[in-house]
Amino acid sequence: MKTLFQIRPARFSDIPAMQCLFRETVLAVNRQHYTAEEVADWASWGDVRRQWEGWFARQHYFVAESPEAGMTGFASIDETGYMHALFVHREWQRCGVASALYETVERFAREAGAGRITSEVSETARGFFERQGFRVDGKQRQQANRLWLKNYKMSKRLDCPELDVK
């Protein structure tokens, strides 16, 4: 059982490993809800390093890493509570990595004074986010590179969660 990992703030030097993890995860894990053409288009969205550098300028990134496996996942959030990313390596799915990363970004959002966390969530990740207390605010189509993919606008209130009626 894979359980040994730690969470730390990401560094610019992590970008190549994050790009690789992103691509491999999308191609392997998201095939259950998206076509091969859709996942290929989505995976290519993270190929440009300059784009990642821009995301780093606007978001706070955290990585999960294991002594034996290296990077096992990453997540990002900004001060307003917008969570741009949460990806876990395909071999570390259902090992607690996503939950630990989510707890880290939620703690960051609370400390930043955000009243809610919002995200655009894939069909594949929707169940995980619902288990964290998120609700679907709407269904949408989001452009990856060439293609428009189905996903969900989701949110979780941090200030008064009891008001978040499903």
State the predicted function of each range.
Residues 58, 82, 115, 148-150:
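Exposed loop/turn and edge beta-strand positions of beta-sandwich/beta-sheet ligand-binding modules
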Residues 129-130, 134:
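Conserved active-site tyrosine of GNAT-family acetyltransferases
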Residues 118-120, 135-153:
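Conserved catalytic-core motifs of GNAT/GCN5-like acyltransferases
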Residues 96:
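Conserved G/P- and acidic residue-centered "switch" motifs that form tight phosphate/ATP-binding loops
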Residues 109-121:
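Conserved GNAT acetyl-CoA-binding A-motif
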Residues 9-12, 20-93, 102-104, 108, ...:
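Acetyl-CoA-dependent GNAT
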Residues 125-126, 145:
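Short secondary-structure capping/turn micro-motifs that flank functional sites
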Residues 1-16, 159-166:
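Conserved N-terminal entry element of GNAT/NAT acetyltransferase domains
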